[in-house]
């Protein structure tokens, strides 16, 4: 039974077009991938990697989730998919306490949001914007940079991510 599951996972990885990627992984990472690949969609590399990253994230294996997100980003063929993987990577990096990397992805997430906002995908964008929330979490909680946090809130207001009322509330909470 154990070997059949392993073989099924490997076949799924192959069907998703990830054989070469999988071959160069460390033995430890191969075990992790097979574990999280169980039940993953096999129709695309991106979908399988997202499934693996979400599984790792759900197990609080944040460093591995972030690593898988970086691989998945290479298979994201639309701006919406890049945005989706970026949001997951932000949380994985944040929870791994990799603040600077997370903040860099937050900046990219903001840019992607602005780009997507005017597209046909805009209604699909979630209300919970990880790039926005984690930007403030990092600037205030880790860097203690209240000035930059206020500037970020102003920018979020300018691009329509937060309302004027929300801007006042959030700025007041920084005091």
Language-model features, listed with the residues they occupy:
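Long, contiguous interaction/recruitment modules in multidomain scaffold/adaptor proteins
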Residues: 1-42, 64
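Terminal, low-structured helical/coil segments at or just beyond the last alpha-helical repeat
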Residues: 13, 145-175
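Helix-turn-helix repeat elements of alpha-solenoid scaffolds
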Residues: 18-30, 57-70, 98-115, 143-146
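Alpha-helical junction/boundary sensor with strong preference for TPR arrays
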Residues: 40, 69, 75-79, 106-120, ...
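Amphipathic alpha-helical repeat scaffolds of TPR domains
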Residues: 41-54, 78-97, 104-111, 125-139
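Alpha-solenoid helical repeat scaffolds
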Residues: 82-87, 118-123, 133, 151, ...
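Acidic, low-complexity, intrinsically disordered interaction modules
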Residues: 116-120, 126, 138-142
């Amino acid at each position: 039974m154990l070997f059949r599951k392993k073989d099924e996972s490997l076949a799924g990885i192959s069907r998703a077009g990830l054989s070469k990627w999988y071959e160069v992984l460390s033995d430890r990472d191969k075990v992790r991938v097979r574990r999280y690949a169980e039940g993953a969609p096999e129709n695309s590399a991106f979908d399988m990697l997202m499934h693996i990253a979400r599984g790792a994230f759900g197990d609080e294996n944040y460093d591995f989730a972030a690593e898988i997100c970086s691989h998945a980003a290479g298979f994201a063929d639309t701006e919406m998919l890049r945005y989706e993987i970026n949001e997951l990577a932000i949380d994985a990096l944040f929870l791994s306490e990799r603040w600077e990397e997370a903040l860099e992805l937050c900046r990219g997430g903001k840019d992607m949001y602005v780009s997507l906002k005017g597209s046909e995908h805009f209604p699909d964008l979630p209300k919970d914007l990880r790039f926005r929330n984690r930007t403030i979490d990092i600037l205030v909680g880790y860097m203690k940079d209240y000035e930059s946090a206020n500037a970020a809130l102003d920018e979020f207001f300018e691009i329509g991510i937060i309302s004027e009322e929300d801007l006042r509330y959030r700025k007041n909470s920084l005091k």
